[in-house]
């Protein structure tokens, strides 16, 4: 009694085999069964009997009362209608086949099988979703159009996000031990940086560093140094991690990778140059070569694409994750990302909502912080002090809700002072931590050297002094 649908997979046998093998693991309570129950739901299985078996097994597992073998079969049959003899007979035949195989899948195979079943489920749900959209478009009434679009967006986002779910359970004593260790550090007067340091002491005191699973948004108007600040964060993180096992990923949708490296090199050498000025190159040649030798082997991977979709970003992170620990992902910048290859009539606000929600989901899925730059709207320039607020996030969608932190780069509007700063290439800026889900809000004063793309803390020692 398989579930009937109007379509067929190109590779039915692989999906059927994957579901059957997972049922063997469930029926025999195999090692690695936690992954199956954490990643899959009954809806993910194609065959109705498998849905019934899985639902019953998961319910008992969650009650800390796992049942296996014939006991599981009897529990499933007990839940069925007394007159449903055909389903009961089919379950008995199915269970006999499952239990005949003595060797259940190991943990490595289970991981692969779960992936096959989950992807097939997403594909199936997308096809059903598309069919529903097609059928309903002929019933649309003009006065319900906006509500219809919102419902379509919500349903589609749920399906996409279900592909990225990665749920793990932690025992309470494990969480308690971690928290106690942090409390003891504070008691001893030690600086608590539970994530990667930003490179700025005062900012770290507010944020405790960039922590796995967090989405951090850096927002400003054009020309305020967003990319430069991202490069500063990238450089700082790359110096802290193990180059043999860890990596920082930088997705640049605006600049080419050579431009990113050039800015990093100027930041590291604290000198500026252009390839068209030979005299300048001659003057700073030694500094540039020394700085390049220090940073050329840092564990950084650059991706420079003028157009990237969410799936392409996820694919790249997944690929790198096979060989390295992805410790930080940086995206420059959020509004240049495409949610899909074709936006299917989504408004830009709806698309940005999908982007920010998905980036947050990626941060949790890959257990890494993601820092994304974002543009502020022109509204900010209409206010007297031009101090940014959360609603200034351009085409914001739900950025302010999805982000764990929102940092604004703010410069004064004092024309005389700004002219002096232009002449010296040294600007006084405030980093305004306007949202901090897990800590206090606050401000950090920095100097920005535009000629070398460097942000320098005004009131604290250099990064090397702080964290060496």
Swiss-Prot record:
InterPro entries: AAA+_ATPase, DNA_helicase_DnaB-like_C, DNA_helicase_N/primase_C, P-loop_NTPase. Pfam families: DnaB_C. It catalyses: Couples ATP hydrolysis with the unwinding of duplex DNA at the replication fork by translocating in the 5'-3' direction. This creates two antiparallel DNA single strands (ssDNA). The leading ssDNA polymer is the template for DNA polymerase III holoenzyme which synthesizes a continuous strand; ATP + H2O = ADP + phosphate + H(+). Keywords: ATP-binding, DNA replication, DNA-binding, Helicase, Hydrolase, Isomerase, Nucleotide-binding, Primosome. The keyword Ribosomal protein does not apply. Disruption phenotype: Probably essential, it was not disrupted in a global transposon mutagenesis study. GO terms for cellular component: cytosol; primosome complex. GO terms for biological process: DNA replication; DNA replication, synthesis of primer. Residues 189-462 form the SF4 helicase domain. The keyword Calcium does not apply. Its EC number is 5.6.2.3. ATP binds at residues 220-227. Coiled coil: none annotated. Gene3D superfamilies: DNAb Helicase, Chain A, P-loop containing nucleotide triphosphate hydrolases. GO terms for molecular function: ATP binding; ATP hydrolysis activity; DNA binding; DNA helicase activity. Homohexamer. The main replicative DNA helicase, it participates in initiation and elongation during chromosome replication. Travels ahead of the DNA replisome, separating dsDNA into templates for DNA synthesis. A processive ATP-dependent 5'-3' DNA helicase it has DNA-dependent ATPase activity. Belongs to the helicase family. DnaB subfamily. This is Replicative DNA helicase DnaB. The gene is dnaB.
């Amino acid at each position: 009694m398989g579930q009937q649908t109007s379509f067929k997979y190109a590779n039915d046998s692989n999906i059927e085999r994957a579901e059957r093998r997972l049922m063997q693991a469930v029926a025999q309570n195999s090692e690695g069964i936690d992954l199956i129950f954490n990643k899959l739901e009954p809806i993910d299985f194609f065959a109705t009997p498998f849905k019934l078996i899985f639902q019953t097994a998961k319910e008992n597992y969650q009650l800390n009362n796992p049942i296996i073998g014939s006991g599981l079969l009897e529990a499933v049959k007990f839940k069925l209608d007394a007159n449903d003899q055909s389903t009961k007979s089919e379950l008995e035949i199915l269970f006999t086949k499952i239990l005949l195989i003595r060797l259940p899948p190991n943990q490595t195979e289970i991981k692969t099988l779960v992936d096959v079943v989950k992807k097939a489920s997403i594909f199936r749900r997308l096809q059903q979703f598309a069919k529903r959209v097609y059928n309903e478009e002929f019933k649309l009434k003009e006065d319900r159009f906006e509500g219809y679009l919102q419902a379509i967006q919500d349903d589609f986002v749920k399906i996409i996000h279900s592909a990225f779910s990665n749920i793990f359970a932690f025992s309470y004593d494990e969480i308690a031990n971690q928290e106690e260790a942090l409390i003891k550090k504070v008691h001893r007067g030690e600086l608590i940086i539970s994530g990667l340091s930003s490179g700025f002491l005062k900012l770290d005191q507010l944020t405790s560093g960039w922590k796995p699973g967090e989405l951090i948004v850096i927002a400003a108007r054009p020309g305020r140094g967003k990319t430069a600040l991202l490069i500063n964060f990238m450089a700082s993180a790359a110096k802290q991690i193990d180059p043999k096992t860890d990596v920082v990923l930088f997705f640049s949708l605006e600049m080419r990778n050579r431009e990113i490296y050039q800015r990093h090199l100027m930041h590291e050498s604290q000198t500026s140059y252009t390839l068209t000025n030979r005299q300048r190159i001659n003057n700073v040649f030694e500094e540039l070569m020394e700085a390049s030798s220090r940073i050329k082997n840092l564990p950084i991977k650059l991706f420079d694409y003028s157009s990237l979709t969410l799936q392409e970003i996820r694919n790249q992170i997944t690929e790198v994750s096979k060989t390295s620990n992805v410790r930080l992902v940086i995206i420059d910048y959020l509004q240049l990302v495409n949610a899909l290859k074709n936006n299917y009539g989504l408004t830009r606000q709806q698309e940005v909502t999908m982007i920010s929600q998905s980036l947050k989901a990626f941060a949790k899925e890959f257990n890494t912080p993601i820092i994304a730059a974002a543009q502020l709207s022109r509204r900010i320039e209409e206010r007297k002090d031009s101090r940014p607020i959360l609603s200034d996030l351009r085409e914001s969608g739900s950025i302010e809700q999805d982000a764990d932190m929102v940092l604004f780069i703010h410069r004064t509007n004092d024309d005389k002072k700004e002219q002096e700063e232009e002449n010296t290439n040294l600007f006084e800026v405030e980093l305004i931590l306007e949202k901090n889900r897990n800590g206090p809000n606050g401000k950090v004063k920095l100097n920005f050297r535009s000629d070398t793309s460097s942000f320098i803390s005004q009131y604290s020692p250099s990064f090397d002094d702080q964290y060496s």
